[in-house]
C-alpha cells in the first residue's frame, strides 16, 4: 500500500518511520473515526503540517480497509489528467514526439521510435517500453522513473473535439500509492500547461 518513496519522505519529514506511524495510530485512532478526525488528530497530536496530516491519514485509512479515490482492483492506483487546446491534433502529436516535446514527459532522448517493443531511456533515467502505437491518436507504454521500484503504465490520447480543438488525455496506472498519484497528478498538470504554451505560442 505504501511505496518506498512515500516511506522515505514520511521519515524525512516527520522523523518517524511509516511502520512506527502504523503502530502509533493503531493505538490512538478509533475504527469509526472520520477522515477529518484522523487527519486533525495527526496534525494536533503529532505536530505535522496539514498536508502531511492529510497524507498520513489517507495512507493509514487504507490499512483500516478504506479504499481511497483513484484506486481500482485491476489498474491499481491511477490518475487521469486532460487538457483541451485550440490547435490541431496533428500539431499536438508532432510536438509530443519531437525532442522538445519528449523532454517534457520523458526527458532528454534524441527521438522515440514509434514501434511496439521499442525500449527507451532518457538521460534523466525515465525508461520503459512501447506497447501500443496508433499514430496521431494513441500511445501506450510503460513509464518508470529511476528511483521507482516498479514501472507504471502510461496512455496518451490525442483527440479532436467537435469545435476543432484538441484534447490531450493522459492516463497512468499501476502507481505505487496514492501519495505518488498526487505527485504525478501535479507533474502531468504542469506538463500539459507547459505543452499548451509551447504548442500555441512556439518559440
Regions found by a protein language model. Give the residues of each.
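Short, highly charged C-terminal tails/helix-capping segments
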Residues: 197-203
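Beta-strand/loop substructures that line and gate deep hydrophobic ligand-binding cavities in soluble
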Residues: 146-195
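Juxtamembrane/disordered regions of integral membrane proteins
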Residues: 14, 20, 54-55, 85, ...
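Short, surface-exposed coil-to-beta transition loops
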Residues: 80, 123-127, 149-155
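Hydrophobic pocket/interface hotspot
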Residues: 92-93, 102, 130, 141, ...
Amino acid at each position: 500500500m505504501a511505496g518506498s518513496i512515500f516511506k522515505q519522505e514520511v521519515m524525512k519529514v516527520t522523523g518517524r518511520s511509516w511502520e512506527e506511524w502504523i503502530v502509533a495510530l493503531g493505538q490512538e485512532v478509533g475504527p469509526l473515526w472520520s477522515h477529518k478526525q484522523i487527519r486533525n488528530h495527526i496534525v494536533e497530536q503529532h505536530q505535522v503540517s496539514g498536508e502531511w496530516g492529510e497524507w498520513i491519514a489517507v495512507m493509514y485509512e487504507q490499512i483500516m480497509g478504506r479504499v481511497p479515490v483513484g484506486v481500482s482492483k485491476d489498474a491499481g492506483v491511477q490518475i487521469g489528467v486532460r487538457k483541451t487546446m485550440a490547435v490541431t491534433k496533428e500539431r499536438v502529436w508532432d510536438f509530443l514526439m519531437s525532442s522538445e516535446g519528449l523532454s517534457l514527459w520523458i526527458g532528454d532522448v534524441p527521438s522515440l521510435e514509434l514501434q511496439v517493443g521499442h525500449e527507451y531511456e532518457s538521460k534523466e533515467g525515465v525508461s520503459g517500453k512501447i506497447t501500443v502505437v496508433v499514430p496521431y491518436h494513441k500511445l501506450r507504454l510503460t513509464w518508470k522513473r529511476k528511483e521507482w521500484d516498479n514501472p507504471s503504465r502510461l496512455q496518451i490520447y490525442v483527440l479532436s473535439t467537435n469545435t476543432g480543438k484538441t484534447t490531450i488525455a493522459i492516463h497512468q496506472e499501476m502507481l505505487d500509492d496514492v501519495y505518488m498519484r498526487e505527485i504525478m497528478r501535479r507533474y502531468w498538470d504542469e506538463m500539459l500547461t507547459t505543452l499548451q504554451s509551447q504548442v500555441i505560442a512556439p518559440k
